[in-house]
Amino acid sequence: MANVTPDLVKALFVGFGKNFKDGLAKAPSQYTEIATVVKSTTASNTYAWLGQMPGLTEWIGDRTLTAIQSHGYSIVNKKWANGVEIQRTDIEDDNVGVYSPLIEELGRAAGEKADELVFGALTAGFKTACYDGQYFFDTDHPVGANVDGTNQKSVSNITDDSTGVTEANAWYLLDCSRSLKPIIYQERKAPTPAQITDANDEKVFMKDVFTYGVDSRSNVGYGFWQMAHAVKGKLTAENLWKAIEAMRAVRGDGDKRLAIRPTHIVVPPSLAQAATKLLERELRAEDGVAVDNEFKRMNLKLIVGDYL
């Protein structure tokens, strides 16, 4: 039986720290492909400038300053935490090896949290508001005929082929070529290990357990809805073309051309095979005839979202 001394506990937790870092490093990461990371220094960030699509006009005389509609869109950071309890009796009985994979998995889970939030935001976009007060994916985003947002009409960023495809099985086209991507990942505090190793701590005294944990603070929100298009329909060449053309046709306030060009297609795992065939085959079938696959030349990047 091992004598549970402070030095022994400290040495064990150094090893647990390595397990955590190993798990964190192994976490697959896709979120930066479709999300802009914003470092936060307060409890929340307000993105009042959302709605502005800057452009240049000819300078004749005084500089042209255009009144832009202001928005009060805020993202409030949330706290995330989890941990593993290490029984004192397991330390006494030299049975701590069982905790190493648990703590490594804790690190992996911490590393995947951003992916979970970012890709979850796509699915939640049908029921969560963005900067203009409409759901991020909606049929009636207000776009003004005037630069200041007045004299509005409704614009959709959803294609629905009425085949009964649910939001959970939707797929998405995104323009991720701009400095602000469709999703905003706001990070206040990166995943940080925390531990309770003092034998005199109340929790150790009352429950006879030590604790290795992790906490972080972050949240997600939405950038420009114009950069994203959701398709509640089958993944077919026809629907893909409809979505591409719909994105390319979107204009900003004042009928400003936005030059939206989809760069990524994001699909749930259930559509991975269909998407791969559609994008990567040299030929595809059209009206029973094999034709050149134009999507292969478009260089749309396929992302299979594990958290869709």
Curated annotation (Swiss-Prot):
Any matching Pfam family: Mu-like_gpT
InterPro entries, per database record: Phage_Mu_GpT
Family listed: To phage Mu protein T.
Name assigned to this protein: Mu-like prophage FluMu major head subunit
